[in-house]
């Protein structure tokens, strides 16, 4: 159903915001559970269902993406279908977490009904139960840095009832010389190499001041 919204978040909103590189402590138990407790969604996309021990309102039956795998600076078309077993009303929300390796780049909560309207899907809350088939095209930002990105998106009703949990793992290869010359210098390459060094311990950011502890 609204899988295209989350996939848009995973690729457009999440990775665009990820270039700010807000590094935080890697101690999220919920993240570990999502990675271990997951099952691939039919269709060949990198997305899997997660939190399999919970009852979800949305049964995502299939997701197909073109191109597969995604490419930076290119459009990505997502086709999805699924069954919604209960209503979704105003106040529903989705949490999105993005990591580059073990580094947390983004952890944010979005208004699900607002995202539905702004993503031009022809849907608005309240949503009734039923079967949905959707197609959505989003743009993958050119400035996505190379690396393996892990994403977890969890959606909930206004009463905190689980709607769905999706997790994805997408790899963007190193930039070719011609691509580097066209890429905006939003991130210092030397800093990126340091951040991606597996020997490096993540810094813990002080939430009050924004400085490293």
From Swiss-Prot:
GO terms for biological process: intracellular sterol transport; sterol transport. CDD domains: PG-PI_TP. The keyword Signal applies. InterPro entries: GM2-AP_sf (IPR036846), Ig_E-set (IPR014756), ML_dom (IPR003172), ML_PG-PI_TP (IPR033917), NPC2-like (IPR039670). Residues 19-37 form a propeptide. GO terms for molecular function: phosphatidylcholine binding; phosphatidylinositol binding; phosphatidylserine binding; sterol binding. Disulfide bonds: none annotated. The keyword Signal applies. Keywords: Lipid transport, Signal, Transport. Residues 1-18 form the signal peptide. Catalyzes the intermembrane transfer of phosphatidylglycerol and phosphatidylinositol. Monomer. Belongs to the NPC2 family. This is Phosphatidylglycerol/phosphatidylinositol transfer protein.
């Amino acid at each position: 159903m609204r899988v295209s919204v989350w996939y848009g978040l995973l690729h457009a909103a999440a990775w665009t915001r990820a270039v700010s590189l807000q590094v935080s402590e890697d101690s999220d138990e919920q993240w570990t559970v999502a990675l271990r407790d997951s099952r691939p969604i039919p269709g060949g996309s990198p997305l899997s269902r997660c939190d399999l021990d919970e009852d979800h309102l949305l049964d995502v039956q299939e997701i197909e993406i073109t191109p597969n795998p995604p490419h930076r600076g290119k459009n990505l078309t997502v086709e999805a279908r699924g069954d919604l077993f209960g209503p979704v009303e105003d106040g529903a929300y989705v949490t999105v977490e993005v990591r580059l390796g073990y580094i947390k780049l983004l952890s944010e909560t979005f208004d699900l009904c607002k995202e539905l309207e702004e993503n031009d899907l022809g849907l608005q809350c309240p949503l009734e139960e039923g079967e949905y088939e959707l197609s959505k095209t989003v743009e993958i930002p050119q400035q996505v840095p190379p690396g393996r990105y892990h994403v977890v998106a969890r959606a909930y009703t206004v009463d905190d009832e689980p709607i769905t949990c999706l997790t994805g793992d997408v790899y963007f290869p190193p930039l070719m010389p011609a691509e580097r010359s066209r890429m905006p210098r939003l991130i210092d390459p030397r800093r990126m190499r340091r951040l991606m060094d597996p020997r490096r311990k993540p810094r813990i950011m002080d939430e009050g001041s924004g400085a490293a502890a």
